[in-house]
């Protein structure tokens, strides 16, 4: 079953309105997104045991999922602020991927 990406955007709009976050500037939300991407990277490194932080206040087990949720939340918020139709974006992105080649190890 396919869930519309726009539904997640609408839900994020509702939460932002409820929390009073609708007046945030696009550049502020962008900076918050990049901060969360860094936190996701750190959580992935912890999960993959690339490095180990000491003195943590909480267990790192669910951090990847939670940080990824934060990243998606800010992406949905930006898509709302920029009036992006996420379902259309995903279809167009899929078309682009058909021809894109990566040399990944």
Language-model-detected regions and their locations in the chain:
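Flexible "arm" and connector segments at domain edges
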Residues: 1-68, 72-105
